[in-house]
Amino acid sequence: MPENRSLALAAASSQQTRPVPQPVCQAVSVPCVTSLEAFHRAVADFAITDLDLMIEPEALAAARRSLDSSSLLLLGEMHGVRENPLLIRTLMQAFGLTSLALEWPEDLAPVIQAFLSGQPLADHPWLWGGDGRITAGHLAVLAECAAAGPLELVLFNGVIGADWSWSQRDEAMASRILAASVPGTRTLAVAGNAHTSTSHTELGVPMGARLASRRPGLQEIRITYGGGSFWNFEPRQFASRIGPEAMMRLYLHDGALALDLPVATEAVVPQRPQPMRESP
C-alpha cells in the first residue's frame, strides 16, 4: 500500500490548560465514544452495506469529466453522519477510484496506515476531536478498501498559523492535496461542505475554489441531507428538506452535482474532552 505523504506538525503549545466537562454520549444510540476499546468495538460492529444510490446518466458523465480533466472529484459533506463513509465507498466503486483524500489531521497518517496494515488502532490525541469527520464507519470502510487492493490515502488538514484567515487555511489544505497527488491517479477529496465549493463564498476563498483554479474542470458533489440526525460535538438534527420516501440519487441541478440522502443517522464519533487554553 502506498505510503502517505504528510507534513510534520509543529510542537504543541506549552500554555497552561484546564479540564472541561466530559462529552455526553446518549445511552441508546451511543453516537460518541470516549475510550479506545469502545471505538475498536464500534469499528468492528459497523455494518458495511451497499447503498441503493441511483446515479443519473448526466451526473455520471459530469463526474467522469471532472476526474478526466482534473484528476479530482470533490465531495462536500456535513460531518457526523453514519452514511457518509458508505457514500464515499459507493462513489469510489462507481468511478473505479483507489485514491481518497480526507479532511483529517495529517499527523494521524502513521496511525491510520498502521491500522490499515492490520495493526490495532493506536491511541492519538487527534482521534478525539468529536466534530464527526472521523467516525467508526470511516475506519471500517477504509479497512475494507485497503484489504481489497492498493489504497492511496491523503490526510490534508494540518497546522495553521495563529494569524491565518479562513481562506489561508483552505489554501493550505488545497496545497496539501496537490502536493500529494500522484500523476495518473484520480482522487475523491472529501471535506466539510463549507470547503468544497469551487467558487468564492461569504466565508472567503474555499479549498475547492483554490483547487479549481489549478485543476480546470473540477466538480463538486454536494450532499443534501433531507432530514435525520448527526453528531457534531453533540447530537444535532437536520431540518426536513426531503421526504423520507425520496430516492437516494446523484444528479445534475443547474449544472452542479447534487446527491440527495433522504434520511441521515448519527455516526459513532470518537470524542474526549479537549483542554481549553488560557491566555498566557
Task: Go through the PLM ranges and name each one.
Residues 2-280:
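Compositional signal for N-terminal targeting/processing segments
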